[in-house]
Amino acid sequence: MATFVQKPAEVEKKWILIDAEGLVVGRLASIIANRLRGKHKATFTPHVDDGDNVIVINAEKAVLTGKKYTDKKYYWHTGYPGGIKERTARQIIEGRFPERVIEKAVERMVPRGPLGRRQMKNLRVYAGTNHPHEAQQPAVLDVAKLNSKNTRSA
């Protein structure tokens, strides 16, 4: 019996909707990364993009545990000498694009490379409750019911 290897033409992608309100960011990102990669499927093949399309709503209401809300820093470099910049998670969540906290958490859990970049394009994160993907009829995934540790009261 030969090992099963899925071909790109055989991939069936579903649309998943996750409400991030009250969910712990790291645990949520781990679940999203597995869904994007397709590791939850029996047909998982490491070199094929067979993950699902994931829609995350209420990203601004996701929760960081401990003192990460005030102490966690996100760094980037402008490319100029002395151009290291930083922002705390609090500044990002209270800023214009609070969805970037979840995007960065998931991005750092997906492999870096051409396949990882293609899988990240299947992630759509929205700060509020509205999303333009009603036509895809996404199935709702209740992450809070998967494990009691996935939620944290604010």
Curated annotation (Swiss-Prot):
It comes from the Bacteria. InterPro entries: Ribosomal_uL13 (IPR005822), Ribosomal_uL13_bac-type (IPR005823), Ribosomal_uL13_sf (IPR036899). Keywords: Ribonucleoprotein, Ribosomal protein. CDD domains: Ribosomal_L13. GO terms for molecular function: mRNA binding; structural constituent of ribosome. Part of the 50S ribosomal subunit. This protein is one of the early assembly proteins of the 50S ribosomal subunit, although it is not seen to bind rRNA by itself. It is important during the early stages of 50S assembly. This is Large ribosomal subunit protein uL13. The lineage of its organism: Bacteria, Pseudomonadati, Pseudomonadota, Alphaproteobacteria, Hyphomicrobiales.
